Design a protein with these regions (language model features):
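Non-catalytic terminal extensions that flank enzyme cores
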Residues: 1-46, 67-69, 102, 168-169, ...
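Active-site cores that bind ATP or allylic diphosphates and position pyrophosphate for catalysis
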Residues: 71, 75-77, 83-84, 105, ...
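Beta-rich nucleic-acid/ligand-interaction surfaces
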Residues: 110-114, 272-275
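N-terminal catalytic cores of NTP/NDP-binding nucleotidyl/phosphoryl-transfer enzymes
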Residues: 13-90, 204-237
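Short polybasic/polar patches that bind polyanions
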Residues: 26-27, 63, 94, 121, ...
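A glycine-rich helix N-cap at a beta->alpha junction
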Residues: 85-110, 116-119, 124-127
Length: 309
């Protein structure tokens, strides 16, 4: 074997499973031969070095194959999000040496997501449930036992449409009703058991103010945002493996009437970065800061990127 062939063989062996998937898609001419990824943080805290791994993967895959990685802020929960974190996240990404293509927000798609939800109600694929969260959880069943259908599951379509509009008009208090997708309460995948796709949140949004009172859940916004933007390879950590069938189903629904295989994006999952004796959770780091157990995000000894910028 020549030196060049040996080098090529080594490089080929070094491909990870995501790179293999991307190369296979390119060879088959999928997605018009383009590669587009995204880094989708929620602006509810500062990034930590676990995010740095995801950033390197999202941006690295796009760069390796001549594509683009966009930055999308998953801002669907106004109670926890702030523009302070938006600016800090952008600063951290640039400090790591990367530059995004376009800057997007899930809130850019609130109208499209709302229209999609309305269509699902009209098609009998979603309904308004007036049970509280404890009742809904109790009816979910277990991984080995089917769930119980909500008494509101088969309510008239016009009634659900009217109530959905009231959810967004401010007439409905938080926790009083939700919009659920009508899928399969006996599915072995718990995420298919009529998941909640919209809830009422009356906290003003950092971008849209008080325009919206009904907000999409992550599982409903994530895959559709990928679709709206033209993402080809959606990279997530392993806890989203059980969510992938739901991701695919919602994409099928939003693409209904179109070629399901045309420009079809897929979700791929990878391991989180974990360090011994180190908190690697933005949520838990935020608790430390809010409870004044540390002196701030840039305190030495923690895993936030703020410590290193």
């Amino acid at each position: 074997m020549t030196e060049m062939n040996a080098t090529e063989a080594t490089e080929k062996k070094s491909l990870n499973f995501i790179e293999q998937a991307v190369e296979n898609d390119l060879k088959e001419g999928k997605n018009g031969g383009k590669v587009q990824t995204r880094f989708p943080p929620e602006p509810n805290g500062y990034l930590h070095i676990g995010h740095a791994k995801a950033i390197c993967l999202d941006f690295g895959i796009a760069a390796r194959y001549g594509g683009v990685c966009n930055l999308r802020f998953d801002d669907t929960n106004p109670t926890k999000e702030d523009m302070e974190y938006v600016e800090a996240i952008k600063e951290d990404i640039q400090w790591l040496g990367f530059q995004w293509g376009n800057e997007y927000y899930a809130s850019d798609y609130f109208q499209q997501l709302w229209d999609f939800a309305v269509n699902l109600i009209k098609e009998g694929k979603a309904y308004i449930d007036e049970q509280n969260s404890e009742q809904i959880a109790a009816q979910k069943g277990t991984p080995t036992q089917p769930g119980t259908e909500s008494p509101y599951r088969n309510r008239p379509i016009e009634e659900s449409l009217e109530l959905f509009n009231k959810m967004n008009s401010g007439e409905i208090e938080e926790g009083k009703m939700v919009l659920r997708a009508k899928i399969d309460m006996a599915s072995p995948n718990m995420h298919f058991r009529d998941p909640i796709i919209y809830r009422v949140v009356k906290t003003p949004h950092h971008r849209t103010g008080e325009t919206w009172k009904a907000y999409p859940m992550y599982d409903f916004a994530h895959g559709q945002s990928d679709y709206f933007e033209g993402v080809t390879h959606s990279l997530c950590t392993l806890e989203f493996v059980p969510h992938r069938p739901l991701y695919d189903l919602f994409v099928d629904w939003v693409k209904e009437g179109k070629d399901l295989d045309d420009n079809r994006h897929h979700q791929y999952e990878f391991n989180k970065l974990n360090l011994n004796y180190t908190l690697m959770s933005k949520r838990n780091l935020l608790i430390l800061v809010k409870e004044h157990l540390v002196n701030g995000w840039d305190e030495i000894g923690r895993a936030s990127c703020r410590e290193r910028v």
